[in-house]
């Protein structure tokens, strides 16, 4: 019999008062996260931002349904976060974008193309944005979800 674990908060796990059997054939959904990926880039609205460049901080979350790695312990059965970093770095440095929205969308599309993810969240932030006010950072988050292929609904005439 396997133990059921209950999540309390983001980082702690505890056993519930009663033990429950877990279906060993079930694959839980896994979130692969990369936080604090720092890449020097040349993105921005102003020509100066594009010429001089600046550091961007990325946060990524990939929702991996039916992740086999929970059973196999093989990196090829999940999302390799090293490869995630490579994809982000390439997308962020191969050309310049005026908006973080576009950059985040390009990164999310590439991650969805490469990995079998249900959804991808990409956040890019400028730790020192070119604004005349004291701010900790300015950032954008884009979420892409894989669409479900639906059969036309005859009742709706679609």
Kindly give the residue locations of the regions a language model identified.
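N-terminal, polar/charged subdomain of small-to-medium soluble alpha/beta proteins
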Residues: 2-158
